[in-house]
Design a protein with these regions (language model features):
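Conserved HGGG/HGGXW glycine-rich cap/lid loop of the alpha/beta-hydrolase fold
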Residues: 1-44
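Active-site loop/oxyanion-hole signature of alpha/beta-hydrolase fold enzymes
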Residues: 31-67
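Short beta-strand immediately N-terminal to the catalytic nucleophile in serine-hydrolase-like folds
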Residues: 68-70, 95
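Gly/Ala-rich beta-loop-alpha elbow adjacent to hydrolase catalytic centers
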Residues: 70-74, 78
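Flexible "cap/lid" loop of the alpha/beta hydrolase fold
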Residues: 83-121
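Conserved alpha/beta-hydrolase catalytic His-Asp/Glu region
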Residues: 124-159
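Conserved serine/cysteine hydrolase catalytic core
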Residues: 147-212
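Catalytic histidine-centered segment of alpha/beta-hydrolase-like enzymes
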Residues: 209-225
Length: 238
């Protein structure tokens, strides 16, 4: 009997292999599909990144019955991918997507979006300095010592992303889809919690908060894996 297919879409800075390393144990239960998006090692640099274009790029990976999971910028991509090809989606999970526009009017979300706009429009143009500013903003650890070539490539790709805080998420289309949704945050940021709370309400999604790893909730390993596995298995049983 084939295992459920789980497509794991990584976000900014690091590739799929690095983002989802703690999810490798799930390969005993599911077919894990972990692409490295364009602009990330081992591929070359890119001139621009667009979440809607990235959603279309996922089309060949979305076989019928796919469970789509996205972290951060990958969560924004996953939302568009699921709305684009709902007939292929068995479930949708997003982890702290920076879709700040859905929570417009929330003070924390508005402040985060303004800070991101300032960083991208007027921040440092040197990749390492830019990445330090970004990691600080999302409450992620800053590596000690010199940044690796892979991180610097991730920083260059980060700098040319289409702004996710301006994304107009297709909430009505997604709310009308029959597949279950799960929204996860790390309990470290009022802005990300606000986004996730709106997605829970507007999409009729399940909601979970897993503290301890900041923005990179999936790096918790077993607690996240058990949450995701239980959700996928419930979706399979529907």
């Amino acid at each position: 009997m084939p295992r459920p297919r789980v497509l794991l879409v990584h976000g900014s800075v690091v590739n799929g292999d690095a983002t989802w390393a703690a999810q490798r144990p799930l390969a005993t239960r599911f077919e894990l599909v972990i692409p490295n998006r364009r602009g990330f090692p081992p591929g070359p640099d890119v001139e621009s990144v667009d979440y809607e274009d990235e959603a279309a790029w996922l089309d060949p990976l979305m076989a019928p019955g796919t469970h789509v999971v996205g972290h951060s910028y990958g969560g924004v991509i996953a939302l568009f991918a699921a709305a684009r090809r709902p007939e292929l989606v068995r479930s949708l999970t997003v982890v702290e997507p920076p879709a700040l526009a859905v929570a417009r009017g929330n003070p924390a979300a508005d402040a985060f979006a303004a800070g991101a706009e300032e960083l991208w429009e007027h921040g440092p143009r040197e990749p390492e300095a830019f990445l330090r500013g970004f990691l600080t903003a999302v409450n992620a650890p800053i590596p000690s010592g010199a940044f690796s070539p892979a991180l610097l490539q991730g920083a260059r790709t980060l700098m040319v992303e289409r702004y996710p805080w301006r994304a107009e998420i297709p909430l009505l289309e997604l709310a009308a889809t029959p597949f279950p949704k799960l929204v996860v945050s790390g309990g470290h940021s009022a802005a990300f919690d606000a986004v996730c709370d709106v997605l829970e309400e507007r999409l009729g999604a399940e909601r979970a908060v897993l503290p301890g790893a900041g923005h990179a909730v999936q790096r918790l390993g077993e607690p996240f894996n058990e949450l995701l596995a239980a959700f996928v298995e419930r979706a399979e049983a529907r």
